[in-house]
Amino acid sequence: MATYLIGDVHGCYDELIALLHKVEFTPGKDTLWLTGDLVARGPGSLDVLRYVKSLGDSVRLVLGNHDLHLLAVFAGISRNKPKDRLTPLLEAPDADELLNWLRRQPLLQIDKEKKLVMAHAGITPQWDLQTAKECARDVEAVLSSDSYPFFLDAMYGDMPNNWSPELRGLGRLRFITNAFTRMRFCFPNGQLDMYSKESPEEAPAPLKPWFAIPGPVAEEYNIAFGHWASLEGKGTPEGIYALDTGCCWGGTLTCLRWEDKQYFVQPSNRHKDLSEGEAVAS
């Protein structure tokens, strides 16, 4: 019985299936953890959602920013961008079923026995685990309710960018969403910077990657995350696992077998068109 952690799939269905075949993943015996951003950019978002949903209790996933954006597109709040290649999913006969399932997925996964937590972008150093759990539940409750379109309409934005237990309403929900799904850099006090996307080496002072700032969760738990493909899975402290290695951009899809910490990779079926800055079919 093995636990496999896989980084952002981004619609790369063929690579996902090839990687699972490589590690001999067996639903019902093994468990698959996914860092979110199941959809967008790659050609197979529909197949990815259908497959992941079919795994039932054999999968544990977290929502990423692209998954939330898909829900906003489906709700008529955001525009369907051609580069996201979501039209086959949005027009599928089972789109309602798939997307209503998706919006009921969590932002945070915790395994106390393994001392493992997973969130798409990571865990802000301003939170302890109890706060992270409560914050995740706040957003999950709204997403799974009939009022979820109102939240999706208000989730876009970069403020507030500093946590306070006194935050209320949509501002609180927006901060939580950004921390779980969009965070990369923080100021030394843990305040989020939502603008910088470069590599840690190129970030302006005093910004630091969120995982470079000591926080209570990282003191007790391992943290697995995706979202930050330019890290290429490198440069994190012990116990912090960056799993997005840019499959949809021509990189690889990465899997970590938790029990022995062995990595497996599946090369992308796509290549990066440097002139366009977009992944195109090879």
UniProtKB/Swiss-Prot annotation:
Statement: the UniProt record of this protein carries the keyword Iron: no
A Pfam cross-reference name: Metallophos
CDD domains: MPP_ApaH (cd07422)
EC number: 3.6.1.41
Superkingdom field: Bacteria
Gene Ontology MF terms in the entry: bis(5'-nucleosyl)-tetraphosphatase (symmetrical) activity
Claim: Hydrolase is one of the keywords in the record: yes
Keywords on record: Hydrolase
InterPro entries listed in its UniProt record: ApaH, Calcineurin-like_PHP_ApaH, Metallo-depent_PP-like
Catalyzed reaction equations: P(1),P(4)-bis(5'-adenosyl) tetraphosphate + H2O = 2 ADP + 2 H(+)
NCBIfam families, per the entry: apaH (TIGR00668), PRK00166.1 (NF001204)
Family, as annotated: Belongs to the Ap4A hydrolase family.
General function of this protein: Hydrolyzes diadenosine 5',5'''-P1,P4-tetraphosphate to yield ADP.
Name of the protein described by the UniProt record: Bis(5'-nucleosyl)-tetraphosphatase, symmetrical
Species for this entry: Escherichia coli O1:K1 / APEC
Protein encoded by which gene: apaH
